[in-house]
Amino acid sequence: MASIWGLLSPWIPYFISFIAFLLLLEQISYIKKKRFLPGPTLVFPFLGNVIPLVTNPTKFWDLQSALAKSTSHGFSVNYIIGKFILYIHSTDLSHKVFANVRPDAFHLIGHPFGKKLFGEHNLIYMFGQEHKDLRRRIAPNFTPKALGTYTDIQQRIIIKHFKSWLDEASKSPNTPIPLRLLCRDMNLDTSQTVFVGPYLDGESRKRFNVDYNYFNVGLRKLPVDLPGFAFRNARLAVGRLVDTLSVCVEQSLNKMKNEEEPTCLIDFWMQENLREINEAKINGLQKPFQYSNKELGGYLFDFLFAAQDASTSALLWAIVLLDSHPQVLEKVRSDVARFWSPESEEPLTAEMLTEMKYLEAVAREIIRIRAPATMVPHIAGEEFRLTEDYVIPKGTIVFPSVFDSSFQGFPEPEKFEPDRFMEERQEERVYKKNFLALGAGPHACVGQKYAINHLMLIIAMFTALIDFKRHKTDGCDDISYIPTIAPKDDCKVFLAHRCTR
């Protein structure tokens, strides 16, 4: 042991000097990239400010937003595990990022370490004509016919879960129940059934739910890709989820080859793919695309992720906002009652939802004032001139804030006012550039009509079937990142039957 120490000891000063040199280079690199922008003067070696981000993300992002608003530049900077990050408050600059998603500018990544977590077969990483073609092929998944099919499926699942919630609440009427996990489970059940319908059996669903929970937890943890760490568990879980969905793709493809009626999203998708392939064959053309089942499974996982967490967030905030605005709640109930009554025993149809204009305005206002996914991370593939006096360095992770944009432009943006989206005011059109919660540019949410319909359906049924009251405590409505935003108390409410159904 002494001999080993004797061999190493002469090198220790050089090793320490080398580490000190690396630390110095890191600080110089950060300062050079930061320039005149608001942000930390110096950063913690190697880790940067990842610990504050993980331990209190709400405080971290609130500070970045405040720094971005503190100057006329409209953006601020920080440093996370070797990555220089730039937070954008300005709506105009956010649009500049969204409009320049291409190989030599910005790459959408979905998460600061998204490519490692989500895998290669992912819609968000695509560019150009290939991306346009895929979105075109996805479009038939959201036609009125498809949305009508989904509404029937969603309604059955929603009622099942509402009954379960009410049964739980009736066991202890004076104790509030937290809805976040209940909403998550309901939306996961809904998403699975709408997207892959009969192709997931009971055992597959159980495994799917466990793996999706691994994924969700890993999104909020340090990106340590080692055995036993949440990030590694999440990465491996995504692989298993995609494999499961790939099997569903194959089963759906076989069903659609037999010209059976579509019963879920993947059926509509495979039906359209087969139509395009057959049309090319008739015209003597080559097969128009080459998607493997694995690739399609990856794209399906994108849909699931987008639908699941955003829908849960939106529903929780709907309950919070409707509880605190009883006059809006009454107008929602009146709007729903004009077209549907739970006592009628008739289903609430997609056509009925189309007629509920005030309900749609409420859904859009909820998404505006509490954008579920508050930021849309991109990475700069090359240097990019964002303003006249600042060039974003290559490799920078850029966070355009769609949440901040919702509070720019609109009159009294802090006020929950669904009337702003009614025909008389048309603020959705007047301030269209500020309404970014559903995205913008080539990667705008391809399923936004489905997302709005889903939220409208749940609100309509929840308000018609259930009486609810928030359990108010200090800070209960503060924002918590999980990774989409939710009320800090997990939305604790008292629930009771409103009708006999």
From Swiss-Prot:
Reactions accelerated catalytically: 5-dehydroepisterol + NADPH + O2 + H(+) = ergosta-5,7,22,24(28)-tetraen-3beta-ol + NADP(+) + 2 H2O
Q: Name one GO molecular function term.
A: monooxygenase activity
Q: Which InterPro entries match?
A: Cyt_P450, Cyt_P450_E_grp-IV, Cyt_P450_sf
Keywords, A to Z? Answer: Heme, Iron, Membrane, Metal-binding, Monooxygenase, NADP, Oxidoreductase, Transmembrane, Transmembrane helix
- The EC code for this enzyme is 1.14.19.41
Q: Transmembrane region positions?
A: 4-24
Pathway membership of this protein?
Steroid biosynthesis; sterol biosynthesis
Question: Which coenzymes or cofactors are required?
Answer: heme
Q: Where in the cell is it found?
A: Membrane
Q: Which residues form a coiled coil?
A: none
Q: Which Gene Ontology biological process is one annotated for this entry?
A: sterol biosynthetic process
Q: Does the keyword Iron-sulfur apply?
A: no
Question: Looking at the UniProt record for this protein, which Gene Ontology cellular component terms does it annotate, in alphabetical order?
Answer: membrane
One of its Pfam families is p450
Membrane-topology descriptor: Single-pass membrane protein
Q: Which residues bind heme?
A: 445
The organism sits in which domain of life? Eukaryota
Quote the PANTHER family the UniProt record gives: C-22 STEROL DESATURASE ERG5, CYTOCHROME P450 26
**Family classification:** Belongs to the cytochrome P450 family.
- Any idea what job this protein has? No activity with 24-epi-campesterol.
UniProt protein name: Cytochrome P450 710A11
What is the organism field in this record?
A: Solanum lycopersicum (Tomato)
